[in-house]
Amino acid sequence: MTLDSYDKLLGTVLQEYKILSEYKRLQNEDLGGLYVIPSFENSFLWFGVIFVRSGPYKDGVFRFTVSLPDKFPNDATVPTVVFQSETFHPLIDPYNGTLELAEAFPKWKSGENHVWQLLKFIQYIFASFDEYMSLAEQSANNVAYELYGQNRPEFLRKVEECVRLGQSRLYDPAPVQDRNYIVFDRFDRETHGPVLESLKQGKANEVTTPPSSGLSWVKEGVFQPLSKQG
């Protein structure tokens, strides 16, 4: 192995370590309702899904991807977030699903900016939507932005449509062949029943789970993972 090859390999290993560290940081953040995991095939691509718990988008389930730039984190280029289904939101491009991040992250600052901050921003623009709109100065969807200010009932109608669309696609087959793609399975009493009962009894930590199949489950009609019944 030449010196140049060794340096290149070392640089790749260090970069992978930094990406892994970014993912590990998520464990210390309050990202309730938002789930991400790096692709098995490509650590620069992360799969995500957010279950919105409040605001106009409540009960919405929206899939997205996070793409890290080639030189991450030592690059001023901001990661790219793309929503996978039509999401009617002032910050989401209606044609390609790209989330507008320029206002929140004008450029990426290594050591100062982290992926968890980007994910927190995604949480914020859905769960605290009205607060966000009171501060927003940029838009990727002018129709959504103008309707919010000029015709609130029509805006909410379109939001409800995209919420229903996201719910209807929750169980769609994975569009890519990747072991880490987040897939949801319909509730199965034999497989998921013991976990649900333990959750209801406050004994989730005592459950012995079988080997992972790569699937998560959501009770049909209740759009929260591992939902408890009242």
UniProtKB/Swiss-Prot annotation:
> Where is each UBC core domain found?
14-168
InterPro entries for this protein: Ub_conjugating_enzyme, UBQ-conjugat_E2_core, UBQ-conjugating_enzyme/RWD
Family note? Belongs to the ubiquitin-conjugating enzyme family. FTS subfamily.
What PANTHER family does the record point to? UBIQUITIN-CONJUGATING ENZYME E2
* Protein name per the record: Protein crossbronx homolog
Source species taxonomy: Eukaryota, Metazoa, Ecdysozoa, Arthropoda, Hexapoda
